[in-house]
Design a protein with these regions (language model features):
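Acceptor-binding helix/loop patch of EC 2.4 sugar-transfer enzymes
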Residues: 1-47
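Short aromatic-enriched loop/helix-cap "lid" or pocket-rim segments at secondary-structure transitions
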Residues: 9-14, 19-20, 70, 91-94, ...
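Conserved donor-binding/catalytic core segment of Leloir-type glycosyltransferases
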Residues: 105-123, 129-133
Length: 166
């Protein structure tokens, strides 16, 4: 689990709402319908699922513990497998420090596009190029592109802005 949707009626993150702990109803995220309570209906249907053969796997101890609070999941089996990202190596840093470290300009808007193979049509580079064409006149000297992944000169040449590769 990467969010709390399995434990709630419809929310991925319930915010301050704790109705899922007892019974989801009249969800503050939904427009009210006086004739039908979608949250209550979905929560009731989720409660009918047999939990004996399901193990919920959370990506953190926190998400697992929050999901266990859910009314209909209290008897379910839970475990967590933390994300395999080294948070000491990958952490937030000041924007200017990061830009300097990667040789990126400090005075430009940067559009990042990342994929293992940037030219893979499923990744949508053509849509980014089209969007850049629309931005070109208004932001000619204020935008640069940052590409992360395997790219080609053919792809890079299609961008109307300066391209930085990492």
């Amino acid at each position: 689990m990467h969010d709390l949707w399995p434990a709630t009626a419809i929310c991925h993150y319930p915010g301050g709402c704790e109705k899922y702990i007892s019974n989801c109803y009249q969800c503050p995220m939904l427009k009210r319908n006086p004739f039908f309570d979608l949250a209550a209906s979905v929560f009731k249907e989720k409660g009918k699922i047999g939990l004996s053969k399901i193990t919920f796997v959370g990506c953190s101890r926190w998400i697992m513990e929050e999901a266990q609070k859910g009314n209909w999941l209290r008897t379910a089996c839970f475990t967590s497998i933390p994300n395999p990202i080294d948070v000491t190596a990958f952490k937030r840093m000041e924007k200017q420090v990061a830009r300097k470290r990667f040789g990126l300009p400090e005075d430009k808007f940067l559009l990042l596009f990342a994929a293992a193979k940037l030219s893979d049509t499923r990744k949508g580079a053509i849509f980014l190029i089209e969007a850049c064409e629309k931005l070109k006149e208004k932001y000619q000297d204020r935008i640069e592109i940052v590409l992360m992944g395997n790219s080609s000169e053919e792809l890079i040449s299609q961008f109307p802005f300066k391209v930085n590769t990492l």
